[in-house]
Amino acid sequence: MAVGTTPGELRELTDDELKDKLRESKEELFNLRFQMATGQLSNNRRLRTVRQEIARVYTVLRERELGLASGPAGEES
């Protein structure tokens, strides 16, 4: 099974939790890129999965901004 967070799991998080997840993912991507540049990265696939996770978080945040989806448990953001 894929490592990471599914869109359904992300939609259950609050906006603040999503922003924290986004920050953590961006930090991880930075570290992975640094490891790649120094030749220490053993799992190149992780770069792609982290980028996809960042895109998923941005998508959920944008859906809420446009009113296409509500926050967790039907709360409006």
Curated annotation (Swiss-Prot):
One of its GO terms (molecular function) is structural constituent of ribosome. GO terms for cellular component: cytosolic large ribosomal subunit. GO terms for biological process: translation. The keyword Cell cycle does not apply. The keyword Lipid metabolism does not apply. CDD domains: Ribosomal_L29_HIP. Keywords: Ribonucleoprotein, Ribosomal protein. Pfam families: Ribosomal_L29. SUPFAM superfamilies: Ribosomal protein L29 (L29p). Belongs to the universal ribosomal protein uL29 family. NCBIfam families: L29 (TIGR00012). This is Large ribosomal subunit protein uL29. It comes from Mycolicibacterium smegmatis (strain ATCC 700084 / mc(2)155).
